[in-house]
Design a protein with these regions (language model features):
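Short, acidic/polar
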Residues: 21-34, 92-95, 184-197, 251, ...
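N-terminal beta1-alpha1-beta2 module of alpha/beta enzyme domains
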Residues: 1-71, 179, 294-297, 301, ...
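Internal, glycine-rich beta/alpha segment that forms the wall or movable "lid"
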Residues: 79, 88-198, 212-218, 229-230
């Protein structure tokens, strides 16, 4: 199992009162350090408002990833995830194809259907019910799959939420056979079926105890359509707000005060350590963990601790085979 790092962008208020240029420079500093320390992949996510409101600095993920593609030359890059509610799928595919060129074939295109109604309202996007948002995501996956696959014919699709007609996309993908497509989520009915039909990877957000059941259902969804379950990579997403036993968050807890009080009051046996969780996921055969690390805006120290935990858990770091 490999180690991916979710970079801070400001969604958790990490850059409150920061100059935006300094915030950008700090993100690049962290990305370069993570690459040197053996991180396999760097990830950004799509939020357009900070989690708890306010006017803190928050940087947009696609343009930030374009900068990362230039500034950080070796590690893989990905999204956890783009919000299809905000996006035209054909334009998303075109942007992804361009990013794959800029990065020399290092992009994983992560897609989801969004969950924050306040963000949609603020930007004037319609926030559909969950069932409809997932249907929209399915249509986006169909169009994008056609557009980012090398040597495919022009994309053509007519749906309820999106339509393209004989659409040529050049370049399509530096990678072969296509840009890898990731879906985020843990819904066993719709999300898992979309993963089986369209995706190269699914990024789950479940704890170690629930992982085996999720993988069992994923295997069923693949088998329903005649796909070998082993061809669908399974990874885990760990937000920086997730609490671990023995980890204080490096000065930025990424939680509301009431959440901090709840975690601090928990018994040591109620929470696994990060090493224990990562080792469990590795033993269950997951492809990678994609983790946020609290406190990175303020200090490099939490990143070094994270790297140590990854190594102790037996994760494969760049330049090392496990």
């Amino acid at each position: 199992m490999k180690a991916g790092l979710i970079l801070p962008q400001g969604w958790f208020g990490e850059f409150e009162s920061w100059d935006p240029i300094r915030a950008y420079e700090r993100i690049i500093e962290l990305a370069k350090l993570a690459e040197r320390l053996g991180i396999e992949s760097l990830w950004t996510g799509e939020h357009v408002l900070t989690k708890w409101g306010g006017e803190q600095v928050l940087l947009e993920c696609v343009t930030l990833t374009a900068a990362l593609a230039v500034e950080v030359p070796r590690v893989e890059l990905g999204f956890t995830v783009l919000n299809s509610t905000f996006r035209n799928p054909a334009l998303t595919a075109k942007m992804a194809s361009t990013l794959d060129v800029i990065s020399r074939g290092r992009l994983t295109l992560g897609l989801g259907c969004g969950f924050r109604e306040d963000e949609a309202d603020a930007f004037g996007y319609e926030f559909l019910p969950t069932k409809q948002r997932l249907a929209l995501l399915g249509e986006h996956l169909e169009i994008i799959s056609q557009m980012v696959t090398a040597d495919a014919p022009p994309a053509d699709f007519t749906g309820e939420y999106a339509t393209v007609r004989q659409l040529v996309n050049n370049p399509r993908s530096v990678q072969r056979p296509r840009i890898p497509i990731l879906i985020g989520g843990h819904g066993p009915n719709v999300t898992f079926r979309l993963a089986a039909k369209y995706c190269d990877e699914i990024n789950l957000d479940v704890l170690p105890a629930a992982t085996a059941q999720a993988r069992s259902v994923l295997a069923q969804r693949c088998e329903e359509i005649g796909r070998d379950p082993h061809t669908l990579a399974v990874s885990i997403s760990v937000p920086p707000s997730l609490a671990w036993r023995g980890l204080d968050g490096g000065g930025q807890r990424m939680m509301r005060p009431d959440e901090i009080a709840f975690v601090d009051a928990a018994s040591a046996t109620d929470l696994p350590s990060r090493v224990e969780a990562f080792a469990s996921w590795r033993e269950q055969g997951l492809s990678r963990v994609v983790a946020g690390v609290p406190g990175l805006a303020l200090s490099d120290d939490p990143l070094y601790t994270f790297i140590d935990d990854c190594r102790e858990a037996g994760l494969e770091m760049a330049g090392q085979s496990t």
